[in-house]
Design a protein with these regions (language model features):
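Structural recognition of the beta-propeller blade-terminating site
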Residues: 5, 42-44, 98, 139
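Short loop/turn segments immediately following beta-strands, especially the blade-tip
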Residues: 138-145
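A generic, well-ordered mixed alpha/beta core segment in the N-terminal half of proteins
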Residues: 40-53, 62-66
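Beta-rich, blade/repeat-based domains predominating
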Residues: 16-35, 56-74, 80-81, 91-93, ...
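Short coil/turn linkers that define WD40 beta-propeller blade boundaries
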Residues: 7-9, 46, 101-102, 133, ...
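A short beta-strand motif characteristic of beta-propeller blades
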Residues: 8-15, 49-56, 102-108, 148-156
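A short loop-to-beta-strand structural motif that recurs across blades of beta-propeller domains
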Residues: 1-2, 37-39, 85, 92-95, ...
Length: 183
């Protein structure tokens, strides 16, 4: 991970970390990064602290995209297959890491989390599943738990259109990147 400062200087802030699947700024400074585990990385000295180890989730092969809510909880998708290893997709999960460091599984049946974002009021979580070709929406409770998901947008079959990143604008509109450039 590289940092471009306001003066235009580039520096490497997360050296020698393979497989970064997602990252978010942490409220106390530094970054939260996903990949082989979920870790906090200091932007000052590069110190790393594991927040969620891969072996904490049975059958998980890694973590992909993640985001944080207003309270500082971390929402992340786990993988249950090697995405670039030629394996057939197997469902992973959507998890939340609470403020006390505990992890809860919120939703099952996720093939490839590739975008997470909250509505401006924090009451809805949007979740793109690249291999399923859809964006899910969840209602979010005050404790960070979510209700059952509903289909927010279907982009295709995960082959012809691949939702590969998601951002929610200040006006509440949801922007989804398509890895195949179909729209």
């Amino acid at each position: 991970v590289f940092l471009l400062d306001r003066a235009g200087a580039v520096s490497q802030v997360v050296p020698k970390r393979r497989g970064i699947g997602g990252m978010a700024l942490h409220e106390k400074g530094g970054l939260v990064v996903g990949g082989r585990d979920i870790a906090w990385v200091s932007l000052g000295d590069g110190a790393t602290k594991t927040l969620l180890a891969l072996d904490a989730i049975s059958g998980a092969t890694g973590f992909n995209d993640l985001t944080t809510d207003r309270a500082g909880r971390i929402y992340v998708g786990s993988l249950a297959y090697k995405v670039f290893g030629g394996e057939a997709p197997r469902p992973g999960h959507l998890h939340v890491i609470d403020l006390d460091g505990t992890m809860r599984t919120l939703s099952d049946g996720v093939l490839l989390t590739n975008g997470l974002g909250f509505s401006p009021d924090g009451r809805h979580l949007y979740h793109s599943d690249a291999r399923a070709g859809l964006v899910r929406a969840y209602d979010v409770a005050a404790d960070g738990s979510v209700g059952p998901w509903r289909s927010f947008a279907v982009l295709g079959d995960g082959q012809s259109a691949v939702p590969d990143g998601l951002k929610v604008a200040g006006d509440g509109s949801v922007w989804v990147a398509d890895a195949h450039g179909a729209r």
